[in-house]
Amino acid sequence: LEGGVGALAVASGQAASAYAIQNIAKKGDNIVASSHLYGGTYNQFKNPMSDMGIEVRFVDPSDPNNFAEATDENTRAYYGEVLPNPSFEVFPISEVAEIGRPLGIPLIVDNTAAPVICKPFDHGAAVLIHSTTKFIGGHGTSIGGIIVDSGNFDWEAFPDRQPALNTPDPSYGGAVWTEAVKPLGPIAYILKARTTILRDMGAAMSPFNAFMFIQGLET
């Protein structure tokens, strides 16, 4: 559907947005996010994420330069929604991605509202998420989320900006993810999410919900 190199199914869209950030950011880090977000995501970023020590700096996405102005040495990602709920003001994917890439900052986008219609990876996004509850499921019968890795972001080129993927991970035997995955392809981000964040936090998608979402994709 999205043309990524790997994906991770989780228990909800909220789990997908949280894990997408926590995979590369820790206490003392920050992300710059569009202020035009689904209310649940906005609250997650403003309150629980802040309580964990990850600062979320909200900016008006109508001017992409706002992302650059809010960036500092501890910024780990940019975040936006392709078609925000409820405003539906189109997010400037290409412009924001172009600001972040030279700095080693990936753009993470929520494409829940526009599967098939929009291909964020073609416009420079590095990672995307969906609440699979919506169009992927299609029937409102199941709750789930998914994180998709484009494989198009060079995490290894920015070790200072992306230490989570470029320094030994004590939770996984000291693995350096960008090195460990080289025989497998450009999957450092999504493999780390699967083997550490999902393992430790536990928001796995139920097998029955996964079956329902596959049925939804088929129809």
Q: Where is each model-derived feature located?
A:
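Glycine-rich phosphate-binding segment of PLP-dependent enzymes
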Residues: 1-2
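Conserved PLP-enzyme active-site core in the AAT-like
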Residues: 6-219
